[in-house]
Amino acid sequence: MTRLRCFLGVARRRFPGGLAAMKIHVLPAGPIQTNAYLLTDSARGEAVLIDAPGDIWAEIEPILTETKCKLVELWLTHGHWDHMQGGAEVVRESSAKVRAHKDDQILIETPEIMIEIIGRDLGLEPVKVDTWIAQGDKFEALGVEVEVRHVPGHCMGNVLFYFAGNKDKKAAGAAFVGDALFAGSVGRTDLPSGSFEQLERSVRGQIYTLPDDTLVFPGHGPRTTVGTEKRTNPYLQG
């Protein structure tokens, strides 16, 4: 936890406005270490969870207790099993409202399909979505405006959640991108509804158009920045 808290402190100092009061807890969990992001605001007493890998409730419950925050929403970047495996338990335990993109409705509500794709039964349960989101949607969470950008290619319903920065305050924004983009890589496109050509259009049109200093929080692996990936990502050069 010491390393994580140090990282969070660095991130918080760079965030603008309402984001300055927010802590980002990076929690790799589940069978393939999928990143969940717990956003907590102790002043408001509220928290938001981005993605829900397996057994994530056991990870976030003590943090919610320590920060005196109630989990109010769960946002799914997409409907693949490793990002929603713990979603049903999270909703049962917290009554959090769920947001996701309708293009992944069949994956989220009919997890048997993912069982067929991956070839094993991981005890997946359907997750009830309260609000279907789409490209360009904006809403408020923890006192901050959030923008939805649709980034299909890894799968049809992959979205990112963007918190804008503030140039005047030299504060970077943050984008939680699911499996569209990783540090030095991109999401796989060989699963049903995947398309590398579509993924490339999504990344160039929806992620690379964000400010270069935007912090990118991916579904797997370490964080990066938009500028770093534009300069060095070997899958999207030229």
Regions found by a protein language model. Give the residues of each.
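Short, Lys/Arg-enriched N-terminal segments with co-localized hydrophobic residues
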Residues: 6-21
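Conserved beta-strand hairpin/beta-sheet module of binuclear metal-dependent hydrolase folds
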Residues: 19-67, 160-177
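Short acidic-hydrophobic surface loop/beta-edge motif
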Residues: 27, 39, 137-143
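Short catalytic-loop micro-motif centered on adjacent basic/acidic residues
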Residues: 47-50, 73-76, 148-150
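Active-site HxH/HxHxD metal-binding segment of metal-dependent hydrolases
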Residues: 55-140, 165, 172-173, 231-235
